[in-house]
């Protein structure tokens, strides 16, 4: 176990809202929290896990001891970034930047390196252990661990769906699904038993799966997406899908005529939260909303936001509330008794113009499980760093 790095913590007050904000990292390299489908902070509020390229550009994982700010190294990758969703390249080694998921109740981080699944305990000796081997050459994406800690899920997509020479996520979005469709290729949904490392294929789906989520109350229910063009889904599969324990699958609801994104289970309810926009004069980004449905597709709520653009909307501990990033703010959406949405700015994120083009610079705001803050990324200082606005 190596000695920790010194704290980089800085606390300041947002001049617009008066909120207290902690800047947790300040290296000149990329530092960002985990993707919004995984918490970055453990439930006991002791650790904050982040990805950093402070080691000469190769991504590695670190854990901040929140009481002291000390930074503990979790991995020692020197082989760059594995080619995967959001990160196209020709590299078939290194850490998958889209792969980490944190088990927040057992303080274990899971991640992919090369074509292997690894884990490292935040509370133990912090020595990574190999758990399972994945199919060589298949492209991975965001992963998830079940609430009971027994299962990992990882989507793996046939390598022939990925064109050489691409450099951005946006190129992938335009080409991967058409190639899957034209060539009859699939994404496989793998389940890995955390106790043994044994794996099995739960389902083979004829579209590009990049997000997976176990239901919080039932690890036999899996929420997945169909990734594709960033417009309404005419001519392509619906965005949000439900996968049962026998591998059967069905769309959550009919999704034509709207743009839906960033589906996620509520934290302690089997509700599926998502956001999007209805078409308005041919523009799918208009008439925006945040909504929830149950596993059968029945609506629970929908809050209209009119023309307010959202990058992401993630459920808070109150499942009817969401934390969002607008072009200027980290904010909460809190409905009143008549289901009218109220947007409450928490702080300005000051991410620079054009940050949406770089996945690593997306804010990806997520409330901590203990409830006291919202962790997000901001590139206000040039590269992304890890911040938290306190509630």
State the predicted function of each range.
Residues 1-22, 181-188:
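Blade/loop signatures of beta-propeller domains
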Residues 3-4, 53-54, 94, 155-184, ...:
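Short, conserved, GDST-rich strand-edge loop motifs in beta-rich repeat architectures
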Residues 34-38, 83-89, 94-101, 138-144, ...:
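Repeated scaffold domains used in trafficking and secretory/extracellular systems
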Residues 48-49, 109, 149-152, 221-223, ...:
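Hydrophobic beta-strand positions that form the internal "hydrophobic ladder"
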Residues 77-187, 201-204:
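Asp-box/WD-like beta-propeller blade repeats and closely related beta-sheet repeat scaffolds
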Residues 256-260, 300-314, 340-369:
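Conserved blade-ending motifs and adjacent loop-strand segments that build the rim/top face
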Residues 261-291, 297-342:
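Loop/turn-rich, solvent-exposed surfaces of beta-rich toroidal or solenoidal domains
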Residues 359-391:
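Blade-level signature of beta-propeller repeat domains, shared across WD40, Kelch, NHL, RCC1
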């Amino acid at each position: 176990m190596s000695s920790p790095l010194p704290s980089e913590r800085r606390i300041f007050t947002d001049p617009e809202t008066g909120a207290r904000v902690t800047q947790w990292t300040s290296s000149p390299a990329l530092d960002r929290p985990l993707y919004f489908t995984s918490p970055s902070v453990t439930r006991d509020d002791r650790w904050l896990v982040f990805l950093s390229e402070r080691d000469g550009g190769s991504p590695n994982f670190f854990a901040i001891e929140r009481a002291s700010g000390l930074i503990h190294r979790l991995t020692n990758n020197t082989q760059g970034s594995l080619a995967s969703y959001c990160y196209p390249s020709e590299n078939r080694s290194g850490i998958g930047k889209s792969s980490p998921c944190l088990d927040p109740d057992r303080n274990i981080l899971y991640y992919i390196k090369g074509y292997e699944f690894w884990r490292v305990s935040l509370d133990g000796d912090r020595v990574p252990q190999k758990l399972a081997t994945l199919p060589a050459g298949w492209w991975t994406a965001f992963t998830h661990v079940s609430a009971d800690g027994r299962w990992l899920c990882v989507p793996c997509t046939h390598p022939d769906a990925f064109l050489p020479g691409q450099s951005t996520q946006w190129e992938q979005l335009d080409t991967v699904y058409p190639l899957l469709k034209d060539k009859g290729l699939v994404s496989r949904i793998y389940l890995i038993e955390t106790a043994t490392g044994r794996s099995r294929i739960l389902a083979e789906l004829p579209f590009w799966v990049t997000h997976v989520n176990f239901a919080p109350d039932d690890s036999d229910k899996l929420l997945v997406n169909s990734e594709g063009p960033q417009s309404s889904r005419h001519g392509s599969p619906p965005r949000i899908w439900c996968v049962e324990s026998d591998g059967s699958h069905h769309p959550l609801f009919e999704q034509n005529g709207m743009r839906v994104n960033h589906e996620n289970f509520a934290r302690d309810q089997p509700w599926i939260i998502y956001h999007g926009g209805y078409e308005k004069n041919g523009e799918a980004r208009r008439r925006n909303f945040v909504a929830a449905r149950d596993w059968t597709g029945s609506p629970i709520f929908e809050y209209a936001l009119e023309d307010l653009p959202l990058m992401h909307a993630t459920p808070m501990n109150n499942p009817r509330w969401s934390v969002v990033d607008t072009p200027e703010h980290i904010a909460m959406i809190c409905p009143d008794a008549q289901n009218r949405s109220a947007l409450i700015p928490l702080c300005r994120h000051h991410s620079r113009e054009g940050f949406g083009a770089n996945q690593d610079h997306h804010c990806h705001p997520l409330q901590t499980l203990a409830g006291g803050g919202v962790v997000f990324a901001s590139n206000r200082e040039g590269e992304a760093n890890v911040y938290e606005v306190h509630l």
